Amino acid sequence: RSSRLSSHAGQVSFPGGGIDAGEDAQQAALREGHEEVRLEPASVRVAAQFPELPVAPSFRPVTPVVGWWREPHPIGVGSEIEVASVHTVPVDELVDPAHRFTARLPGFDRTTPGFAVDGLFVWGYTGWLLSTVLQLGGVDRPWDTDDVREVPPDYR
């Protein structure tokens, strides 16, 4: 996310945003993917929709839509106001135990799954969602949940 945003600035996230009039969550996810990272909606097969869940600190409701990018094509920053950079990370890197840890925001007791991939520190809701999708997809590997790392200032 762009450092110019008012919430979750500088954090790693998936494309997303509000649902426009006449859209459902899946249509909104595909539209936002196109607007933010130039993902062609026709290249994605929606695989699942998670239940709505409020995300701290704003507690805005988020409905994750998970898809299979069946026809990869070049993507990149589509909205410089919202997106600082775009990264694609192979599943093999995400499940590598060397890239997994437990993330903790200083001053808070709550932790989330974390990932150190492609020079990024992934944590919070995005870390939880990635970890959940890897588990549900049956590709998760055991990792050291006792390896607790503080969220760096640039990712808070």
Question: Which role does the model predict for each range below?
Answer:
Residues 1-14:
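N-terminal strand-loop-strand
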Residues 4, 18-122, 131-156:
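Unchanged
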